[in-house]
Amino acid sequence: MLTIDGAASANAENLERIRPAMSKARDELQREIGVERLQRAREVGVLRVMLDVDPVFPELLELPEILQVVDHTLTDTAILHLQNGFILPPVEAMGYTVEEAREIFQFSFHRDFRRYLEGYLGCVNTLLNIDEFRESNGATVFVPGTHQLRKDPSRAYLEANAIPAEAPAGSMFVYDASVWHGSGLNTSGEDRLAVNHVFTRSYMKQQIDYVRALGSGFILSLPPRTQQLLGWYTRVVTSNDEYFQPPDKRLYRPNQG
């Protein structure tokens, strides 16, 4: 796991744009889905489709720090598997007991990429820390050396070797998505914000079909590299007419990895 300081503010102007945008995304999600439904799904504070809520979110995909990581690890044909916002409330405000919270996916030890590929890197995370990450406000805990393992470590091993990743606001964690990690519990009395990006090889299915979710008009309003990251050049054809197109008009462009 690598920590890069100052990444979140490099192209998003400043962190103060991101915080209200995340609050807006949370409000829109709660209106659409409802708080009770989110609690049943154990998704309180998780923001899944927010790219069209505020321009600051697609702008994050232009950050040089992120693009350099993606290009170096997965090549420039990689695509965005997900962009998730996290507004981690204090545990007492979540509507769960501490014991219940520890069983929620993001709080339990897990891997974001669960396949063992004999050392082949298929998926990379770039986690932007919008607020300072401290153990007291639920900093992500990592278990060093647990990426690319053929067999799962025991829970006792994970608990004994987990390290809270503390870092200042505006920093970015970069890590192999197969490393074991989990969110800590927030006991600070205040929300803790972060935005996670997971990137994969272009032939791996996205968590969200961003082209369908956002619409072609929105996608085409973005820079070409952002279009590519969102999957615009790796769409799946639905008819013979779409298949038999010249190379520059094909939904799945050549040389996409």
Where are these regions (language model features)?
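Short hydrophobic-aromatic micro-motifs
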Residues: 2, 128, 173-175
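Non-heme Fe(II)-dependent double-stranded beta-helix
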Residues: 2-110, 114-116
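Short, solvent-exposed loop/turn segments at secondary-structure junctions
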Residues: 8-10, 86-88, 133-135, 147-148, ...
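Residues that flank catalytic or metal-binding motifs in active/ligand-binding sites
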Residues: 53, 81-82, 122, 136-138, ...
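A structural signal for short, well-ordered beta-strand segments
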Residues: 83-85, 126-128, 195-199
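Conserved double-stranded beta-helix
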Residues: 149-150, 154-174, 178-179, 184-257
